Design a protein with these regions (language model features):
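TRNA-binding/sensing appendages of the translation machinery
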Residues: 2-24
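Catalytic cores of enzyme domains
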Residues: 5, 22-51, 55-168
Length: 168
């Protein structure tokens, strides 16, 4: 657990992270996957089938559930805009690998915005993009709640965005 806390503290060294609010070590058993999340992507999001990090190209909830079985620990990242969780998660993933978490993999928030139009064949920005939690069937709202976070601030109605780094 000390290594995970050291990793979380590395976030403070990142540049341009004004949107970062908090991060905490969590157990992967608290991460919820559900079929309805993917269904919502398909029918309620205009980015469906437009990038390789969105459905139907991203892993589904069944595949994500299997992936989660390979991990015990994770870091959940809370931010105030949709771009920050992805950026922070990818940077943490790279640092984690150097800290002997060789299975580290990250997930961001929202759809990829690195290309004007995705070629839908082979990602040209794979080193700086990952699928979002929701694109992979993670119920972000319930996962956040399970770990003491709310998706929306009840007082001022601020919407929060989350990223995730799986560690092993």
């Amino acid at each position: 657990m000390d290594k995970i806390l050291k990793l979380i503290n590395k976030i403070k060294e990142f540049e341009d992270i004004d949107e970062f609010i908090d991060a905490k070590a969590i157990k992967t058993s608290s991460i919820v996957t559900a079929f309805w999340v993917r269904f919502k992507c398909k029918y309620a999001c205009g980015n469906y089938n437009t990038t390789l990090d969105c459905p139907p190209y991203s892993p589904g909830p069944e595949e994500m559930s299997e992936l989660l079985k390979c991990y015990d620990d994770a870091i959940l990242i809370k931010c105030s805009n949709h771009e920050a969780p992805s950026k922070i998660a990818i940077n943490l993933e790279k640092i984690a690998i150097g800290m002997e978490f060789y299975k580290a993999i990250s997930f961001g928030a929202g759809s990829c915005k690195h290309c004007v139009k995705c070629n839908l064949k082979s990602c040209i920005n794979r080193s700086i993009t990952r699928p979002s939690m929701e694109a992979c069937g993670i119920d972000v709202v319930q996962t956040a709640k399970n770990n003491g976070y709310n998706m929306v601030d009840k007082k001022d109605k601020t919407l929060y965005f989350f990223g995730l780094v799986l560690l092993k």
